[in-house]
Amino acid sequence: MSIIQNRKAFHDYFIEEKLEAGLVLEGWEVKAIRAGRVQLKESYVDWKNGAFWLIGCHITPLQSASTHVKPDPVRPRKLLMSQAEINRFIGKVERAGYTMMALDLHYTKGNVKAEVGLAKGKKLHDKRDTEKDREWQREKQRVMKNQRGAA
């Protein structure tokens, strides 16, 4: 079950490969995510200190959060991946033009997981081509539906 999706990532990037990774979260963050108070729009994944980190993911703390904990809504969150997955993605990220994006957050067996994708940026003409293709697919579906109804 998906909690939130990063639709902007699919609009601005070609997603070439996907991977599910765990997240290191604090208790108030899990409660806020379950309440749907999370935003992935400006988030990306960065390589630091031998691990991948989710940067820019905004988790708004609940009003009922504990007073002795100082919540930081945009703190970097460590991604939990196997060493083989890390090695495979490091080689691809170090190539020119590739980046890693958080595509969505979802539950797997009660745990919050992030779907991370290896992405390459789209140019303006690529975005236009994608929009034309979507529009054409919609038009085809509309015509097929009308023809089925008329027959």
Curated annotation (Swiss-Prot):
It holds the Pfam family SmpB. GO terms for molecular function: RNA binding. Keywords: Cytoplasm, RNA-binding. It comes from the Bacteria. GO terms for cellular component: cytosol. Residues 121-151 are annotated as: Disordered. One of its GO terms (biological process) is trans-translation. Residues 126-142 have a biased composition (Basic and acidic residues). It is found in: Cytoplasm. InterPro entries: SmpB, SsrA-bd_prot, SsrA-bd_prot_CS. PANTHER family: SSRA-BINDING PROTEIN (PTHR30308:SF2), TMRNA-BINDING COMPONENT OF TRANS-TRANSLATION TAGGING COMPLEX (PTHR30308). Belongs to the SmpB family. Required for rescue of stalled ribosomes mediated by trans-translation. Binds to transfer-messenger RNA (tmRNA), required for stable association of tmRNA with ribosomes. tmRNA and SmpB together mimic tRNA shape, replacing the anticodon stem-loop with SmpB. tmRNA is encoded by the ssrA gene; the 2 termini fold to resemble tRNA(Ala) and it encodes a 'tag peptide', a short internal open reading frame. During trans-translation Ala-aminoacylated tmRNA acts like a tRNA, entering the A-site of stalled ribosomes, displacing the stalled mRNA. This is SsrA-binding protein. It comes from Chromobacterium violaceum (strain ATCC 12472 / DSM 30191 / JCM 1249 / CCUG 213 / NBRC 12614 / NCIMB 9131 / NCTC 9757 / MK). The lineage of its organism: Bacteria, Pseudomonadati, Pseudomonadota, Betaproteobacteria, Neisseriales. The gene is smpB.
